[in-house]
């Protein structure tokens, strides 16, 4: 599977297995950042295995509460900031003991500046894992700086969607600025995800197919050059769990960003409509992923994902390898 790219994985969560990365059968891994404390681990892995690891930097919606809006006048005082921040973004409002156990929040601007530095240093880097997650509830500690998996039982407290959107859109804006691909997590809120993303291209010049046919290639490229600065070029909806109808919405001609859809066995096999959804994805927009935290499991999980794609699309396994490899290269602009 040398030509296959694992479109979404988290091997930095299992540092004891990172030595296995070099000998994986998959050709490359897109390794996700999820929270302020793990961006450095993603960077370290990319430095150690530059030919194998494509880094992706971002704040997952599960960790969006780590960031506070430093433009909010109510959060200027360091003495009251933590309490006010969590009271603003969590619902219902937690008690003081719960808030005290939470990490001290980081300014959004500080994270974005750090991500900007990473993007400059790694021209192939993505933004991710970012997104929106409606049913997510905060865990009841302890808070493990190394793991992206919830530790302990879940609390009754949710991160308000308003705050999730603020953190998400700030990162999409950064992806647009640097023209980088994005890996997106979305659970039970695809309509809100679409409306959040549509802000970036609404009102922009998007020529009709007839207009495109009449334009010379150079004229078309020049006309779009300025418009492209306002939205990311490509977005992967990872472990996609939306409907086939929503695929049509994201992939409509009026949407200038190219949408890809990746699938993992661990997540997508839970859904009874998994095979039907796979059938509904355009053949050239399908990607494979493990979405796993252990390097030792990545090859097998990617292989299982490819097997299910073969079944759903009625492709041979060899044809599936060829098609998914081509799609991965197109997503990353790899030639």
Swiss-Prot record:
Chain's role: Interacts with cut9.
Cystine residue pairs: none
GO cellular component, one term: cytosol
Similarity remark: Belongs to the metallo-dependent hydrolases superfamily.
Organism classification: Eukaryota, Fungi, Dikarya, Ascomycota, Taphrinomycotina
Single Gene Ontology MF annotation: hydrolase activity, acting on ester bonds
A Pfam cross-reference name: TatD_DNase
Protein's name in the database: Cut9-interacting protein scn1
InterPro entries for the chain: Metal_Hydrolase (IPR032466), Metallo-hydrolase/TatD-type (IPR053044), TatD-like (IPR001130)
Residues annotated as signal peptide: none
């Amino acid at each position: 599977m040398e030509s296959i790219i694992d479109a979404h994985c988290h091997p930095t969560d299992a540092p004891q297995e990172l030595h296995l990365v070099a000998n994986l059968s998959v050709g490359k891994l897109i390794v996700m950042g999820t929270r302020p404390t793990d961006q450095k681990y993603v960077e370290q892995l990319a430095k150690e295995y530059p030919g194998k690891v494509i880094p992706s930097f971002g704040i997952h919606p599960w960790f969006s509460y780590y960031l506070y809006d430093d433009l909010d006048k109510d959060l200027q005082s360091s003495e009251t900031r933590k309490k006010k921040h969590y009271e603003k973004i969590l619902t219902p409002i937690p008690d003081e003991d719960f808030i005290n156990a939470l990490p001290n929040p980081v300014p959004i601007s500080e994270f974005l500046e750090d991500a900007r530095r990473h993007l400059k240093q790694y021209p192939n880097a993505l933004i991710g894992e970012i997104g929106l997650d409606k049913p997510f509830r905060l865990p009841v500690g302890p808070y493990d700086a190394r793991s992206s998996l919830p530790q302990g039982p879940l609390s009754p407290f949710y991160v308000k969607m308003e705050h999730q959107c603020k953190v998400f859109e700030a990162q999409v804006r950064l992806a647009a600025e640097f023209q980088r691909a994005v890996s997106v997590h979305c659970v039970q809120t695809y309509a809100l995800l679409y409306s959040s993303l549509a802000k970036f291209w609404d009102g922009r010049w998007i020529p009709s197919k007839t207009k495109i046919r009449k334009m010379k290639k150079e004229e078309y490229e020049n006309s779009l050059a300025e418009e492209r600065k306002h939205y990311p070029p490509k977005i992967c909806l990872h472990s996609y769990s939306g409907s086939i109808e929503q695929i049509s919405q994201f992939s409509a001609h009026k949407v200038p960003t190219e949408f890809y859809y990746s699938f993992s066995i661990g997540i997508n096999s839970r859904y009874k409509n998994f095979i039907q959804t796979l059938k509904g994805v355009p053949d050239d927009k399908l990607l494979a992923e493990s979405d796993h935290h252990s390097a030792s499991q990545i090859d097998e999980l990617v292989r299982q994902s490819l097997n299910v794609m073969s079944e759903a699309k009625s492709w041979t396994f060899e044809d599936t390898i060829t098609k998914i490899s081509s799609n991965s290269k197109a997503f990353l602009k790899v030639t």
